[in-house]
């Protein structure tokens, strides 16, 4: 490709020099440059194509990421710096797409990057949400959800002339398609993220400051929000309509493209493979069968055989609440044709396996989506070794007995291009100098281990952390209005707010630490504890946990005895942009879910990659991190997954007994201290207090004492910075296992078989 001359481009586009352009116009210039470069990249065009269908893709800002993948980042940055401009400030004009929420969507985004980087033919397929999940605001120390209006300012969507009709029970809608280019790192070709929208969508249904809207106007509201509130019947129906709209478009696209590439559809499995990312796209199975039979004349049994050989399913959860189940009557209302096929598939499954535990439709006429995926897909994978073992041994054991050959593990991964090169350029430079640049494409960081006792390298690593903290402090001051001490230990838990992730346990530690400082035990370094994450609007206890955290933040900030030594910050509207600022700066990575409940996690990998030390239960991928780095380079605590499973099985966990221990009672009752309750919302605090005291379904009280002890050991160890940085380096050196390039290679070698 021709060399880049930004000075010449500035003259051509704006008739002025690069030095005289303001940052907004430079941003427009760079967007145009990236679009033109990407447009010259042909699409990957292998015979067999992957369709990675996901309800969410948390792609983050793309300008810098795409410049890295297109190989022009360093050249652009150098020219801008020479002209007196800061690329990071220019990037601030980019709007982050609101197409995802948490780990599921971020994983999908990392996977698309790796699929393209490995030169594989594969597109992501999802929906173009106009307002995303929601934009989070904090009002009176409580979460307020408002629409996330991002489409008006975006520069990344490219219109596609494909359009499809989706038939519902008593009406039909038309879709339109937009694409986002996905270049691969160091690759001449690209893939795409295909996002379907509703041609008749009406943004006017959404009032400006509320996420409440008419859920019955299906022909106008289908693509307004990701995960619309399903706490009522209309919300549940809307979810099903939305999921069927997504998969019907995906299936029609897949079949059209397969025919264009030469398929006669009897051989469709030679031309296409579908990866179902969690259960939201499950209806692609009956929809493909419907299209093959009614639109293309293939016999039902053959259509089932074809689909069974081309659909694979990734399970992302052990929580029963997250394994989607829908009333058959609701599916019949959304699409009678699809419901009829599901009934036939259920009859087939029951004829093959007379076991009610594996039925697709149970005795209550409820459809179990994961069961359909397992019976009528050819592969099911977990996303961490422990998670897969739990699926095989307990949660999905009846299926494992039937289909052991379908089960495999594919431990999650992250793209190093974004999470080092883009998010932490100082660390990327250190790695280049120490071990060469191959890590950018291979993900192999193991050569770094030989520098574990190299004083110069450790000092430089410490300097990268200082630089990352400075960037984070600037971000927090400008975007969050928070001043963080320059010498603070940065302790971070950023993830969806959920009881099983146990933000409430970290809040109890904060109360303990507050009281300890009040008693005169001042830490040598101030400790800043940072939270980030959203709670589902209908999830009351999660909302209460946010309120507790924000009230603690205010309470501590207003106490002159404690504020110099302890700070609590909750990032408003945590997203990929915030993650790219906070994760490189972290010293401590909080991965404290109840053992057996986190499928994998990926923030644990990002923190590890950026030199934070992990404080964790042995849950999800934490187990694999611990095995890689060794006991001396990680901090583990808590009941094991087997112990937790036994407590659930025999029903012997009693929060009340633990609550009555004086040390624990002191912490829990602080929540309802009259003065503290006067600072917050008494109803919320009382409800959370009572839930922890009397229920504590995810067993925060079981682990709190050992958690406090372990955390205090972490803070003490931080004082020996030489030893701390050695541990950080060993963590980075062992993070290569968690490259999404490795994960995708395994998916392809063992499941997809793309050329």
Predicted regions and their residues:
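A conserved ligand/cofactor-binding region detector
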Residues: 1-755
């Amino acid at each position: 490709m021709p060399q880049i001359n930004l000075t010449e481009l500035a003259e051509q586009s704006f008739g002025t020099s690069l030095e005289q352009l303001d940052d907004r116009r430079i941003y427009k210039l760079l967007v145009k440059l990236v679009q033109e470069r990407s447009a010259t990249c042909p699409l990957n065009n292998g015979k067999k194509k992957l369709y990675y269908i996901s309800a969410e893709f948390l792609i983050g800002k793309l300008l810098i990421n795409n410049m890295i993948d297109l190989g022009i980042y360093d050249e652009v940055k150098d020219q801008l710096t020479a002209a007196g401009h800061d690329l990071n400030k220019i990037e601030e004009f980019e709007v982050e797409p609101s197409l995802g929420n948490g780990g599921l969507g971020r994983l999908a985004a990392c996977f698309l990057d790796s699929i393209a980087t490995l030169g594989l033919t594969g597109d992501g397929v999802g929906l173009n949400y106009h307002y995303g999940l929601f934009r989070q605001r904090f009002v009176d120390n409580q979460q307020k959800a408002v629409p996330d209006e991002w489409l008006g300012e975006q520069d990344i969507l490219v219109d596609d002339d494909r359009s499809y009709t989706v038939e519902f029970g008593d009406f039909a809608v038309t879709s339109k398609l937009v694409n986002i280019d996905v270049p691969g790192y160091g690759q001449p070709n690209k893939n795409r993220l295909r996002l379907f929208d509703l041609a008749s969508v009406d943004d006017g249904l959404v009032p400006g400051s509320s996420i409440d809207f008419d859920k019955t106007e299906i022909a106008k509201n289908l693509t307004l929000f990701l995960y619309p509130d399903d706490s009522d019947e209309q919300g549940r129906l809307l979810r099903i309509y939305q999921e069927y709209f997504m998969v019907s478009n995906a299936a029609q696209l897949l079949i059209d493209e397969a025919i264009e590439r030469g398929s006669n559809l009897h051989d469709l499995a030679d031309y296409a493979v579908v990866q179902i990312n969690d259960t939201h796209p499950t209806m692609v199975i009956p929809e493909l069968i419907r299209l093959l039979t009614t639109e293309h004349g293939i016999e039902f049994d053959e259509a089932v055989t074809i689909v069974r050989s081309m659909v694979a399913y990734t399970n992302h959860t052990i929580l029963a609440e997250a394994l989607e189940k829908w009333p058959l009557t609701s599916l019949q209302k959304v699409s009678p044709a699809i419901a009829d096929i599901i009934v036939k598939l259920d009859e087939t499954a029951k004829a093959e396996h007379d076991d009610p535990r594996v039925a697709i439709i149970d005795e209550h006429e409820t459809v179990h989506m994961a069961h359909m995926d397992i019976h009528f897909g050819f592969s099911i994978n977990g996303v961490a070794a422990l998670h897969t073992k739990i699926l095989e041994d307990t949660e999905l054991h009846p299926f494992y007995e039937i289909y052991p050959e379908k089960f495999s593990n594919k431990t999650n991964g992250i793209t190093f291009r974004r999470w080092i090169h883009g998010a932490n350029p100082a660390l990327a430079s250190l790695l280049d100098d120490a071990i060469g640049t191959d890590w950018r494409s291979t993900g192999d960081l193991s050569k770094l281990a030989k520098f574990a006792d190299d004083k110069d390298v450790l000092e430089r690593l410490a300097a990268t952390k200082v630089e990352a903290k400075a960037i984070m402090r600037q971000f927090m001051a400008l975007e969050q209005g928070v001043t963080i001490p320059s010498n603070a230990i940065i302790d971070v838990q950023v993830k969806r707010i959920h009881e099983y992730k146990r933000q409430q346990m970290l809040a109890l530690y904060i109360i303990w630490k507050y009281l300890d400082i009040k008693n005169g035990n001042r830490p040598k370094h101030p400790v800043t504890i940072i939270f980030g994450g959203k709670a589902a609007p209908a999830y009351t206890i999660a909302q209460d946990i946010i309120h507790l955290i924000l009230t603690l933040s205010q309470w501590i900030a207003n106490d002159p005895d404690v504020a110099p030594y302890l700070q609590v910050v909750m990032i408003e509207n945590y997203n990929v942009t915030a993650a790219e600022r906070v994760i490189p700066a972290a010293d401590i990575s909080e991965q404290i879910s109840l053992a057996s409940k986190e499928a994998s996690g990926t923030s644990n990998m990002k923190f590890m990659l950026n030199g934070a030390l992990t404080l964790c239960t042995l849950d999800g991928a934490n187990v694999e991190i611990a095995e890689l780095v060794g006991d001396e380079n990680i901090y583990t605590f808590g009941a094991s997954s087997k112990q937790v499973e036994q407590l659930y099985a025999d029903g012997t966990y009693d929060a009340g007994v633990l609550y009555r221990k004086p040390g624990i009672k002191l912490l829990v009752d602080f929540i309802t201290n009259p003065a503290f309750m006067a600072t917050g919302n008494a109803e919320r605090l009382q409800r959370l207090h009572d839930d922890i005291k009397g229920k504590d379904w995810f067993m925060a009280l079981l682990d709190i004492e050992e958690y406090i002890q372990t955390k205090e050991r972490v803070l003490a160890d931080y004082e020996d910075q030489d030893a701390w940085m050695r541990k950080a380096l060993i963590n980075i050196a062992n993070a290569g296992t968690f490259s999404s390039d490795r994960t995708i290679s395994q998916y392809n070698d063992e499941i997809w078989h793309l050329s």
